[in-house]
């Protein structure tokens, strides 16, 4: 089995359905004997360019290990899901289990927001 990194972008109006979508894709992978090494929900982010007149979308990254049949099934699911605006599947040399650079940035932003919120709470 080969290792893959999958990033898919979901329509912002469908953000509340993202956890269910992730579970569905995880079930597809594990039911065919694959493994999931990392799942990161990057949240709603600014798009680099407009897609279907949208400026923001919900990003999800998955690192998996599966066979070609499972990968074809996942790609088919992405293509025919109207909520998925774009998807990208990249073959990796080895499993990636640590946080991605994008997730590190998300964590840094959350830490800044938490630090900014603390002084206002202390003043109140």
Swiss-Prot record:
Name its GO BP terms in alphabetical order. Answer: translation
Keywords recorded for this protein, A-Z:
Ribonucleoprotein, Ribosomal protein, RNA-binding, rRNA-binding
The portions of this protein that span the membrane are none
Q: Where is the composition biased (Low complexity)?
A: 114-124
Q: Which residues form a coiled coil?
A: none
Give the signal peptide range. none
What InterPro entries does the record point to? Ribosomal_bS6, Ribosomal_bS6_sf, Ribosomal_S6_plastid/chlpt, Transl_elong_EF1B/ribsomal_bS6
Q: Its domain of life?
A: Bacteria
Please give one Pfam family short name.
Ribosomal_S6
Q: Which CDD domains match?
A: bS6 (cd00473)
- Asked if the Swiss-Prot or TrEMBL record annotates the protein with the keyword Nucleus, the reply is no
User: Which parts of this chain are annotated as the region Disordered?
Assistant: 96-124
Q: Which family does it belong to?
A: Belongs to the bacterial ribosomal protein bS6 family.
Q: Summarize the protein's role.
A: Binds together with bS18 to 16S ribosomal RNA.
Protein name stated in the entry = Small ribosomal subunit protein bS6
Taxonomy of the source species: Bacteria, Pseudomonadati, Pseudomonadota, Betaproteobacteria, Burkholderiales
Query: Which gene name does the record give?
Result: rpsF
